[in-house]
UniProtKB/Swiss-Prot annotation:
GO molecular function terms listed in the Swiss-Prot or TrEMBL record: DNA-binding transcription activator activity, RNA polymerase II-specific; RNA polymerase II transcription regulatory region sequence-specific DNA binding; sequence-specific DNA binding
Annotated gene: aptf-4
Subcellular location as annotated: Nucleus
Chain's role: Sequence-specific DNA-binding protein that interacts with enhancer elements to regulate transcription of selected genes. Required for neuroblast and epidermal morphogenesis, perhaps acting in cooperation with transcription factor aptf-2.
Region: H-S-H (helix-span-helix), dimerization, residue numbers: 301-430
Family the UniProt entry places it in: Belongs to the AP-2 family.
Stated name of the protein: Transcription factor aptf-4
Length: 486
């Protein structure tokens, strides 16, 4: 009984291994789909034709193997080895085909030879050639043919002991025989591009491989001439301070970023971005800027994601991030949040040792996140771009592009605030371990507004703390200005 019931062998000719490989490598120009079946004869005897088995589409797992090295595609559904239909629709490479052991077996002349097939020998997801294992031990697994298991008792194949008795070959011999040598020192391996570790985070930008090298692929866009810092227009800000009118420079580089991914601004959005009305003079002005600097706006760019950041220029967005950072540093109640966090941990039946361990581990995690973001700088107006050559670059730069440069400094500001809270909570925990008590706090009545139940002593302490913080900052600024002048 055949191991491959769907493999038709009535019309197969395995007279020699070379002829079989010739048929595989150079299939007949007339495909099975172009041949017509002869009409049935009147007496009911139909013409005998090779049976064509319908093939179902397989999973899209494309792995090409060179046919001249003995590879064939293995069809998992019909359990056959062939590549005559590899270029037809619905056919493809399925899995890893077993290697053809050309070095181990030599066909005896003058005898019918069935091509040797090793049952899934070394069937891994890496690309191999028949010569990969030529210096190792002889193949000891059972050999199979498409018809039946005949190779264990067949005398058609004789081991080539001149090859197999030489022992394991050295690396120099393996590199000579291997048609696909692996260069372990090369930086072109795919996983190197997406390797996220401390060494790659701290390496210089000159060592970044090709796809992420900013000299080759700046800001994941089309390389252009050095006109990026040219001011295309001076426009008013969207969030001017009270009593002032802020103006910001719209550079050519920023205009290219707005017209590219992920926003793809169309001309209607650019009119708002330029703070221009849709009058003829304003329309011509915007079109002239786009034409002068060779910026293409596709007519299909109609469906885009509009956010509150869409009308902001990058200078204004980063100024907003700086103001938010200074407000957070001044008014965020770090001590009160840290005290609340520690009380919650103790309330959940955690002793001080466990609380301190949790807080220190959390601090390490936040520190790692901050370092990961600090070594990067998405391209915005007035900032030099920094890429690190892994998978975070593209997604994080898209985040920065969508927020017009606001996302990166704002994220760093938030994580640094979280770190201060955790560090202060750990400091309170260490003081409690030494016998100190937690600072007292005043509890508000539910539904009562802040400051309504605040005592006079606490209010004075709160105001004095703010005053001392402001005085220290002014003194620091004065010392820095004095040192620069001297």
């Amino acid at each position: 009984m055949s191991y491959y019931p769907y493999y038709q062998t009535e019309n197969s000719d395995y007279s020699s291994f070379n002829s079989l490989m010739a048929d595989i490598c150079e299939p007949s120009p007339s495909s099975s789909s172009s041949r017509k079946r002869p009409a049935d004869s009147e007496n009911g005897n139909s013409a005998k034709m090779p049976v064509v088995i319908p093939m179902q589409p397989v999973q899209n797992f494309t792995m090409q193997y060179p046919i001249d090295n003995g590879w064939q595609n293995f069809n998992m559904i019909h359990q056959v080895y062939n590549n005559n239909n590899m270029n037809q629709p619905g056919y493809g490479w399925v899995g890893q085909p077993p290697p053809m052991p050309q070095d181990f077996y030599k066909a005896r002349p003058g005898q019918t030879v069935t091509p040797p097939m090793n049952e899934f020998h070394n069937a891994h997801g890496t690309q191999q050639t028949p010569n990969d294992n030529s210096g190792n031990l002889p193949i000891s697994s059972v050999m199979y043919t498409p018809e039946s298991d005949l190779s264990t008792t067949s005398a058609n194949f004789t081991p080539d002991w001149n090859t197999t008795t030489n022992g394991p070959c050295n690396q120099e011999k393996r590199n000579k025989e291997n048609l696909f040598p692996n260069d372990d020192t090369s930086s072109g391996k795919l996983f190197d591009y997406f390797l996220t570790n401390t060494e790659r985070e701290n390496e210089s930008e000159n060592n970044i491989p090709h796809p992420y090298n900013k000299a080759v692929f700046p800001t994941f866009g089309v390389p252009v001439s050095s006109d990026g810092n040219v001011v295309a227009e001076v426009v008013d800000g969207r969030l001017p301070a009270v009593g002032t009118r802020s103006k910001y420079d719209l550079t050519v580089d920023e205009l290219r970023r707005r017209c590219g991914a992920p926003e793809h601004m169309n001309q209607s959005a650019l009119y708002c971005f330029f703070r221009k009305s849709k009058k003829k003079e304003a329309i011509n002005r915007v079109k002239k800027v786009l034409t002068d600097y060779n910026i293409t706006v596709r007519t299909m760019q109609r469906q885009r994601k509009v956010t509150c950041f869409s009308p902001f220029l990058e200078e204004e967005a980063t100024a907003l991030a700086r103001d938010l950072d200074s407000i957070t540093e001044e008014f965020l109640p770090i001590d009160a949040i840290a005290l609340e966090m520690l009380e919650k941990l103790i309330f959940n039946n955690k002793n001080l040792d466990i609380c301190l361990r949790i807080l220190k581990n959390t601090n390490k995690t936040i520190t790692r996140v901050i370092k990961t973001l600090e070594v990067r700088q998405p391209k915005i107006t007035g900032q030099k771009e920094k890429l690190k050559g892994n998978s975070l670059d593209l997604s994080y730069h898209n985040f920065s592009l969508t927020t017009h440069g606001f996302g990166h400094p704002n994220s760093l500001s938030h994580y640094r605030s979280y770190q201060k809270i955790v560090e202060q909570a750990a400091l309170y925990c260490e003081k409690m371990q030494k016998g100190a008590s937690l600072p007292s706090k005043e509890y508000l009545i539910p539904g009562q507004k802040p400051f309504e139940n605040m005592s006079n002593e606490f209010f004075v302490e709160w105001r004095m703390r703010s005053y001392h913080k402001k005085a220290r900052k002014e003194m620091l600024d004065f010392n820095q200005a004095y040192s620069r002048s001297s």
